Amino acid sequence: MNFETVIGLEVHVELNTNSKIFSPTSAHFGNDQNANTNVIDWSFPGVLPVLNKGVVDAGIKAALALNMDIHKKMHFDRKNYFYPDNPKAYQISQFDEPIGYNGWIEVKLEDGTTKKIGIERAHLEEDAGKNTHGTDGYSYVDLNRQGVPLIEIVSEADMRSPEEAYAYLTALKEVIQYAGISDVKMEEGSMRVDANISLRPYGQEKFGTKTELKNLNSFSNVRKGLEYEVQRQAEILRSGGQIRQETRRYDEANKATILMRVKEGAADYRYFPEPDLPLFEISDEWIEEMRTELPEFPKERRARYVSDLGLSDYDASQLTANKVTSDFFEKAVALGGDAKQVSNWLQGEVAQFLNAEGKTLEQIELTPENLVEMIAIIEDGTISSKIAKKVFVHLAKNGGGAREYVEKAGMVQISDPAILIPIIHQVFADNEAAVADFKSGKRNADKAFTGFLMKATKGQANPQVALKLLAQELAKLKEN
């Protein structure tokens, strides 16, 4: 029997506000343990939450970017549970009326086709703290993350393969990053994914029993975990077994999912309206103000890069996959850089350098200005493409002007015939055996002179000019 895969994803995204959702403490990642806390985060008796307007701004932008309807009557709810990293014993979230609902996003699949994936809801909530377990036998609670604003985006169960889930996450990350509401860095926990997967016989409308997957710390692992689950569940069903409702984690080392706990039924969090936060309304004017702050999104940029700049679909997709890269490209082209040349450098040498150094484009000294200047001095013959690679590394590490560095470092190509011709004659004088071979008609004897000339000029001879002059002088040599 063949089965249809049914997948839904729950994605938690940390919003990049300066302060937390209900307290004025910093929401920045990476500070010392419990440095970003105050009495609200610690839930001292008598403290009251104060809603950060910037969080609602970000929620509205997310809803608009994901084609969602917006609940204009806003309120928060208490989600009750106890855990050491949650000192209040409840989480302030949204239950029956999320900020956004009934949305969708279009994803591009590997075969070039597109599919629209529904988004059930997007709700605002506070993050919990973090427990760490020391080698000394003690467990420690860090509340830096407590109260960091989150938006949880819950998809419809519209995905029918791990590939579609991967494409959905890729598209979602792009949209959230372009909207400017999160850096969506999975390695820092600012984007976290839980997956729900079930199988059902083809033609059956009723969903099968679902399994929840956690510990999915990369899009690649989401895909691998789902692929493993498809195989595991299909084998159980074909052998006459039943799928249990359970939570599993993906074990990257063993490339398998591991049981965490069996879920007997849905958890009862006893939601009720948050009494310490008043109801408020999101006006049409507020929504339109947020709409005007949204940028051009990846889909529109890709289309423009192809139609206006003449890039291929592949190049346009690669450039727009990351907003930082796309913005860099936009500025470089606006400065007069050739779109194809800038694209080639960003996807080639720049990408290789970033991978080797383990850095992002923002963390190096390369700027649109000095990249465009470097491309210009390649085009005008000041430096060769080979030398340009060395110049690029210097610019990436040290910044500064490309032309200024080339001139100071003595890297300018020699293009003047008045300089090159005497060097060619000296090459002939220094290599009498090669000259004799050439004059006697020995096959490929002329090729050796190219290497001699480049060596004599320490690689600084303009190849096009030098080869033309060399051919000219060799012809004269043969006549004599």
Swiss-Prot record:
Keywords: ATP-binding, Ligase, Nucleotide-binding, Protein biosynthesis
Enzyme class of the recorded protein, top EC level: ligase
Entry's Gene Ontology molecular function annotations: asparaginyl-tRNA synthase (glutamine-hydrolyzing) activity; ATP binding; glutaminyl-tRNA synthase (glutamine-hydrolyzing) activity
EC number: 6.3.5.-
Superkingdom of source: Bacteria
GO BP of this protein: glutaminyl-tRNAGln biosynthesis via transamidation; translation
Enzymatic reactions: L-glutamyl-tRNA(Gln) + L-glutamine + ATP + H2O = L-glutaminyl-tRNA(Gln) + L-glutamate + ADP + phosphate + H(+); L-aspartyl-tRNA(Asn) + L-glutamine + ATP + H2O = L-asparaginyl-tRNA(Asn) + L-glutamate + ADP + phosphate + 2 H(+)
UniProt keyword annotation of Nucleotide-binding present: yes
Function: Allows the formation of correctly charged Asn-tRNA(Asn) or Gln-tRNA(Gln) through the transamidation of misacylated Asp-tRNA(Asn) or Glu-tRNA(Gln) in organisms which lack either or both of asparaginyl-tRNA or glutaminyl-tRNA synthetases. The reaction takes place in the presence of glutamine and ATP through an activated phospho-Asp-tRNA(Asn) or phospho-Glu-tRNA(Gln).
Listed name of the protein: Aspartyl/glutamyl-tRNA(Asn/Gln) amidotransferase subunit B
Gene: gatB
